[in-house]
Amino acid sequence: MYLPKHFQVDDLQILAQLISEYPLATLVGNLDGHLEVNHLPLMLSKDGKKFHGHIARTNPLVKVAEQENREVTAVFHGPNAYITPAWYPSKQETGKVVPTWNYAVVHAEGKLSLIDDPHWIRQHVSQMTDTHEPTYQSNWKLADAPEEYVQMMLKAIIGIEIEVGSLVGKFKLSQNRSPSEYTGVVENLQKSPEENLRAMLALMKKPQ
């Protein structure tokens, strides 16, 4: 990933927060000379050293985990927004401005392995459910479904673990603009009712 220093974020707490809010990862591995790309939610351990998730047993990622080259990259996509040059004060002064795109992503690289343990898989799925259900003010739990059905569904999946080798963020949030232009972006984002632009605004207001 192209990563200018002023966009680089290494703080684990900041990276973990984005991953927690946007857990759906684009997971890329190499299988027989071609890229194997999947999309799945992952959970980061508190120490930032491991990711856990689950996939269908028929997913080609199983073969990726079983081969010698088990290196994968997980990409987490946070807020993103088109930034119009009309928001820059310098547009009126010189006209020397162009559009750009602000965004925040986290890249994790590491080795993929499988966890084929029924007890672990059940515990993992329960943990993931308990983590995300409160967002919808719901108290649904795995135990609410018929046990026979749960067992059938759990048998169809396998756990995965990624041992993190590197974890870095790229938060392109207009840091390379002048203070007045940065302020212009923030002020105009504040006027927008669009959810994605509000998410970008919240991120720009956080200390990086």
Enumerate the language-model features and the residues they cover.
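Binding-site signature for planar aromatic cofactors or substrates
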Residues: 1-208
